């Protein structure tokens, strides 16, 4: 579905019809440097939006997929084709320094990790690069995410269930700083209890972020 407003804070007017041709959840819209908008949704599909952003562009590729006893016309492309996914949802796409990034939760072993792939075109093909955030130690499935650049610093927003380990629907919002390597790849993020806010001098300081020792354990001063 689509809702429209003149300001980010609203009020929003819900449009009577959803965007036709999208069969999935967890949409993400990317405004690319080529001037077009692209929409990504669950299971790694991507399509270009029309200028009105209420429908898909006419020049999107189309494929036919057999599902049970029916044939379904699929619009756009499968950006996860050839990438490790098993089960994927919650994609988030962004652009940085001439590269397009497709980030997404997927099941690597038992629960979800955040993986990512890179491309030179918004619709791929994408090359898998690795993990941004590994599985939570308590096995929760709560790491849907967003990535934002604010005043020159990149931030990684996600959620976990540390405060309700026996019930994965009570989730808390988290934020960590995100850093790139010189080749454009993303450094793996280790979740912290500190986040990105200022720390009082009288409080314990989690020093993992200040150590370059590979595999160093989290310690406190």
Predicted segments with their positions:
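Carbohydrate-active catalytic/glycan-binding domains of CAZyme proteins
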Residues: 1-221
């Amino acid at each position: 579905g689509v809702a429209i407003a003149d300001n980010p804070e609203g009020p929003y007017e819900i449009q009577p019809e959803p965007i036709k041709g999208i069969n999935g959840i967890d949409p993400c819209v990317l405004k690319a440097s080529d001037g077009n908008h692209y929409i990504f949704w669950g299971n790694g599909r991507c399509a270009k939006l029309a200028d009105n952003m209420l429908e898909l562009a006419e020049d999107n590729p189309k494929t036919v997929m057999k599902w049970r006893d029916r044939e379904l016309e699929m619009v756009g492309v499968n950006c996860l084709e050839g990438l490790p996914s098993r089960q994927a949802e919650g994609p988030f796409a962004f652009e940085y320094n001439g590269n397009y990034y497709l980030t997404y939760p997927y099941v690597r072993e038992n629960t979800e990790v955040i993986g990512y792939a890179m491309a030179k075109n918004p619709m791929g093909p994408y090359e898998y690069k690795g993990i941004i955030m590994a599985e939570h130690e308590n096995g929760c499935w709560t790491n849907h995410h967003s990535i934002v650049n604010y005043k020159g610093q990149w931030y990684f927003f996600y959620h976990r269930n540390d405060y309700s380990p026996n019930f994965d629907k009570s989730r808390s919002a988290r934020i960590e700083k995100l850093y790139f390597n010189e080749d454009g790849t993303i450094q793996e993020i280790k979740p912290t209890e500190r986040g990105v806010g200022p720390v009082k001098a009288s409080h314990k300081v989690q020093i993992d972020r200040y150590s370059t020792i590979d595999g160093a354990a989290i310690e406190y001063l």
